[in-house]
Regions:
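Conserved small/polar residues in nucleotide/adenosyl-binding loops
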Residues: 148-155
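Flexible, glycine/proline-enriched loop segments at strand-loop-helix junctions
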Residues: 35-38, 125-137
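N-terminal functional module of multi-domain proteins
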Residues: 2-113, 117-120
Length: 159
């Protein structure tokens, strides 16, 4: 069972690792603070969850920031997760009360969009990686971002 406001890790007997993030209270707070309509709140909540999962791969008080530059009315979506406990996020502009559908989500977040992921560390210079997005949902767009991808700049001496 998933606990509210937690990040949980599971490891199968065959070595498959699964990370589950529940950021429902944080997403609800973002919606309340920024007066977001439902579709925008869903989008920001999903990106908050993805950001928190990506941040759990790090140690030593590292953090991660996502800048999701859309080509839509939303403008840019900003999310941060750090130290494994703290998340925050906001969007430049909310949608015009569009119905919550996967099609509308894809229209707002991924048509000619750009995803910038920045990893912050206390001991290293921040590292940013940029991905051009095509047409997909949030999980499909965050799929290319992985532990290996975010650590690609490190050399063997760093590890």
């Amino acid at each position: 069972m998933i606990k509210i406001n937690t990040i949980q890790h599971y490891l199968s007997m065959s070595g498959i690792r699964i990370t589950v993030s529940d950021v429902s209270s944080a997403a609800a707070k973002v919606q309340e603070l920024h007066h977001l309509p439902a579709l925008t709140a869903v989008i920001v909540g999903k990106i908050l969850a993805g950001t928190s999962v990506l941040a759990t791969d790090f140690k030593n008080h590292e953090g991660i920031s996502i800048l999701w530059q859309t080509n839509s009315i939303l403008g840019s979506i900003h999310t941060d997760a750090y130290e494994g406990y703290f998340i925050r996020g906001y969007v430049d502009t909310a949608d015009d009360n569009l119905p919550v559908t996967s099609h509308n989500e894809k229209l707002l977040i991924s048509d000619k969009a750009q995803l910038t992921v920045t990893r912050y560390s206390l001991v290293r210079t921040p590292y940013s990686s940029r991905i051009n997005l095509s047409f997909g949902n949030i999980s499909e767009c965050l799929g290319p971002v992985s532990y290996t991808h975010l650590r690609a700049h490190e050399t063997e001496a760093d590890l």
